[in-house]
Structure formats: C-alpha cells, structure tokens
C-alpha cells in the first residue's frame, strides 16, 4: 500500500500491535524476517491483520 507503521514492541508470538488509521491492528511480517521495532511498510491487509513488508 506504500504506507508505513511503527512497530514499538513485538510479542513472544512474533506479532505486534500497531496504530493504523487511528485504530490498533495486529501486524505480522510478510516473509521470514522477524518483526523488530522500527518503521515498516504495509504490504497488504489480510483480514484483520496488517502484513508488513520491509523495515526502514
């Protein structure tokens, strides 16, 4: 989507809760790269989760 979100904390399950469009969303990585704190691009929306593409 070209938009980005900030990951502050990653849970033990590898997921994060991020703010997007004024609401909390569960986010997960698109590939094998684990989520780490920082800014990530949004690759797509998958149901109620954001799939994050790359970190920058």
Protein language model features and the residues they cover:
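Terminal membrane-proximal soluble interaction domains of membrane-associated proteins
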Residues: 2-56
């Amino acid at each position: 989507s070209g938009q980005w979100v900030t990951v502050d904390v990653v849970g033990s399950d590898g997921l994060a809760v991020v703010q997007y469009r004024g609401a909390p969303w569960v986010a997960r990585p698109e590939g094998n790269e684990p989520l780490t704190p920082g800014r990530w691009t949004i690759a797509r929306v998958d149901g109620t989760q954001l799939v994050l593409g790359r970190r920058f």
